[in-house]
């Protein structure tokens, strides 16, 4: 890591902004459309099992897409002499939904919700290297909601006006207990 931020925030520090766009549902012309997709993924060595189901519905004025994903990450298997890294596996589920409304030919409203929940995420390095019998994140939860209002214009100085309001919430719990100790330590951070 480079720069002064790497010292303050550690080697995982990331500078700048990354803007990612999730899947957009499309409006249809004519009849309403309904479709779905599914995905099942299995990785050998019990390292990952994933199942996802998604649904898309659209009309001339309303378009929706959403889905749910369930994941079971098993313990990591290292190469050479590392072997199985226990404990390192955890469970996760995520949910996403986005609906768009075509209010007029030039005005559109989008409402979106994303949610991720992870349970019993172990900190392998603390258990193996730092004398802990138990050290894990439980529970980790992140939610993001936003509403986006877009209006196309015929103005010379602007093609479109966009107004976005968003809210996000992160909850992180940590549980730990040192080897040979009966004291279980629970911590919780809730950021909005």
Short names for language-model regions:
Residues 3-4, 23, 43, 116:
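Solvent-exposed coil/turn segments that connect beta secondary-structure elements
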Residues 42-72, 82-120, 141-152:
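Transmembrane beta-barrel wall of Gram-negative outer-membrane proteins
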């Amino acid at each position: 890591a480079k720069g002064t931020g790497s010292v303050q925030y550690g080697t995982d520090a990331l500078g700048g902004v990354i803007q990612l766009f999730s899947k957009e549902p499309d409006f249809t012309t004519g009849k309403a459309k309904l479709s779905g997709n599914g995905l099942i993924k299995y990785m050998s060595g019990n390292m990952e099992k994933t199942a996802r189901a998604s649904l898309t519905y659209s009309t001339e004025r309303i378009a929706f897409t959403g889905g749910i994903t369930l994941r079971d990450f098993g313990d990591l298997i290292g190469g050479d002499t590392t072997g199985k890294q226990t404990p390192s596996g955890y469970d996760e589920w995520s949910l996403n939904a986005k609906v768009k409304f075509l209010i007029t030919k030039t005005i559109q409203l989008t409402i979106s919700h994303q949610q991720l929940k992870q349970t019993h995420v172990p900190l392998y390095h603390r258990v193996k290297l730092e004398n802990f019998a138990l050290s894990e994140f439980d529970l980790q939860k992140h939610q993001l909601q936003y509403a986006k209002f877009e209006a196309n214009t015929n103005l010379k100085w602007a093609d479109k006006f966009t107004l976005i309001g968003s809210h996000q919430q992160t909850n992180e719990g940590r549980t730990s207990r040192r080897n040979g100790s009966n004291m279980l330590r629970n911590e919780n951070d809730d950021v909005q």
